[in-house]
């Protein structure tokens, strides 16, 4: 691919996006460098409309902690998480999947983003935003490779016999965006850090200076706001201005269920980053 042309158009490589998604913007736009620099809200098709009563009730609650509690109560009710037999779950089944909900996916990701829960969340990003999974236990450029087959197997294991898991993640993203807009109404970006071992772990579109790169991130990534924390995960520190609209999860979003985690879950696409030693 002609990198000069790609830089001028700020477009994703063809193998990094799907032609369709379930979002108000196509992947080619939301995954572009222009979007990183000038973000706009991302809305998943029909999610807020379907759950409009939740968001109306949240408008009446001033405390973010109480809003989180209300959100989790709603999730339990809407997806029958406390009454899964009503959703068709068979407790006598050979494989128990009664705890495979959105919280299980988050905890699994935070423990190991290359595990089966991580695969399920990357698959969800593919479906909803059209950003392809580029790395899972290794690069996934070859769809006939063992790595890609292992990724598909992990997805199948994570999604098997779950209760509308993708719909749960849809609502998690929509709630996260609601909280961000409510708490930071005039802010568009947040400075975040990620530890890496080498820049070539990512597809580099262009090197602008010794430390500045334009590259393609995996479709879902962990970042932190703590530079020292990022240093624990690699020899180099990647710094980026991340659009708030690309956040699926932020620290403290669900304080009663996920305590002490300092990770931000960030949607991928093209980003301009700065690379440095600690």
How should each PLM-predicted stretch be described?
Residues 1-98:
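Intrinsically disordered, low-complexity, charge-biased terminal/linker regions in eukaryotic proteins
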Residues 62-63, 115, 243:
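Helix N-terminus capping/helix-initiation residues
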Residues 20, 40, 47, 125, ...:
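Extended aliphatic helical segments
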Residues 210-278:
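ADP-ribosyltransferase catalytic core
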Residues 72-76, 80-221:
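ADP-ribose/NAD+-binding catalytic cleft of ART/PARP-like enzymes
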Residues 3, 169, 178, 225, ...:
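Intrinsic disorder/low-complexity signal
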């Amino acid at each position: 691919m002609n990198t000069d042309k790609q830089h001028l158009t700020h477009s994703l490589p063809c193998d990094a996006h799907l032609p369709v998604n379930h979002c108000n913007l196509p992947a080619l736009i939301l995954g572009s460098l222009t979007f990183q620099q000038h973000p706009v809200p991302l809305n998943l098709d029909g999610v807020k409309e379907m759950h409009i009563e939740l968001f109306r009730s949240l408008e009446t609650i001033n405390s973010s902690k109480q809003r989180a509690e209300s959100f989790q109560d709603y999730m339990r009710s809407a997806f029958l998480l406390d009454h899964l037999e009503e959703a068709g779950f068979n407790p006598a089944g050979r494989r128990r999947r009664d705890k495979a909900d959105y919280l299980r996916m988050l905890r699994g990701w935070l423990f190991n983003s290359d595990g089966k829960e991580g695969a399920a969340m990357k698959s969800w990003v593919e479906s909803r935003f059209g950003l392809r999974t580029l790395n899972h236990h290794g690069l996934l450029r070859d769809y006939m490779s063992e790595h890609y087959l292992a990724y598909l197997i992990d997805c199948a294991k994570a999604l098997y016999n779950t209760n509308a898991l993708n719909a749960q993640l849809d609502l998690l993203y929509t709630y996260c965006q609601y909280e961000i807009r409510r708490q930071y109404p005039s802010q568009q970006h947040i400075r975040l850090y990620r530890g890496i071992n080498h820049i070539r772990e990512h597809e580099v579109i262009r090197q602008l200076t010794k430390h500045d790169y334009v590259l393609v991130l995996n479709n879902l990534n962990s970042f932190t706001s703590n530079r020292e924390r990022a240093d624990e995960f690699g020899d180099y520190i990647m710094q980026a201005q991340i659009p708030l609209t690309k956040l699926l999860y932020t620290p403290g979003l669900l304080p009663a269920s996920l305590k002490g985690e300092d990770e931000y879950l960030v949607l991928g696409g093209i980003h301009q980053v700065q690379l440095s030693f600690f």
